[in-house]
Amino acid sequence: MKFGNICFSYQPPGETHKLSNGSLCSAWYRLRRVGFDTYWTLEHHFTEFGLTGNLFVAAANLLGRTKTLNVGTMGVVIPTAHPVRQLEDVLLLDQMSKGRFNFGTVRGLYHKDFRVFGVDMEESRAITQNFYQMIMESLQTGTISSDSDYIQFPKVDVYPKVYSKNVPTCMTAESASTTEWLAIQGLPMVLSWIIGTNEKKAQMELYNEIATEYGHDISKIDHCMTYICSVDDDAQKAQDVCREFLKNWYDSYVNATNIFNDSNQTRGYDYHKGQWRDFVLQGHTNTNRRVDYSNGINPVGTPEQCIEIIQRDIDATGITNITCGFEANGTEDEIIASMRRFMTQVAPFLKEPK
């Protein structure tokens, strides 16, 4: 079993950037004693939904503060930056951390990112796959070049050379298309905290069928499940503290992108639009009902309730790499306290899949 901690870097109403970032930096430093294997950061731009615009800089800070903690990006919005610059950042962090950096990526969902950085959002899937493959191959060969439809440049050597034999990597996968592509490559997925057990199980069944067909040993692919987490002996308190945070956080998420607007005609995001339509039909676009839904499928409650929820997903998917976000717990001290309860009262009692 592996346990990670994910930082959303959300700016709650009434907090300054200085306070939000200061609290997170302090929590980052303190969590090294809590016992997590990996700490993950998320990339966002132009929104209070997430204040971390450059994950390589954030990862360098965290890696420099610690000696044994692994640090990952979950993930770099890969189509919005030059692949060689990203590759150089990955190589430098891999070398300077002596192999403690995990390169996680996402395709991107926020229209402002693509407009500001000059990328066609409708081509984001193809660009992501092209850049990602290019970077992964270059980590093995030490050279990079491209004559694709999306970027062209001559062959060059890249430095520094890799420290790790295989730089750890993953990609957030929500749609069937992304799941299928990652399965063909035999690359690890990150499963979202906004889907329930049955959807996670179906996603893994699809992945495993395709990956096996393409000759990959699925027992050696290290997928990750993510959660919103609040552990407290008082279940109602855990629910309430998450509600206070999530009702603003989820509204911020919806407002950060126009992909959910009925008038939006952006192609290539059918899964996300369909998921939102399902939420509308189920009443989950109402803030309180959306939070109720989130609390119901995530480990929010007593240690026993949290164990039950995570174990159910472990048994359904076979995934034993668990990553939780604790920012919904309130103050820095409350966040650390919930982390400690998780690592002492939940994590030790989770079992390998049946």
Swiss-Prot record:
Top EC category: oxidoreductase
Q: Does the keyword Phosphoprotein apply?
A: no
Source species: Aliivibrio fischeri (Vibrio fischeri)
Which keywords accompany this UniProt record?
Flavoprotein, FMN, Luminescence, Monooxygenase, Oxidoreductase, Photoprotein
Q: Check the record and name the CDD domains matching this protein.
A: Alkanal_monooxygenase
Task performed by this protein = Light-emitting reaction in luminous bacteria.
Name of the molecule in the record: Alkanal monooxygenase alpha chain
The answer on whether this UniProt entry bears the keyword Magnesium reads no
GO molecular function terms attached to this record: alkanal monooxygenase (FMN-linked) activity
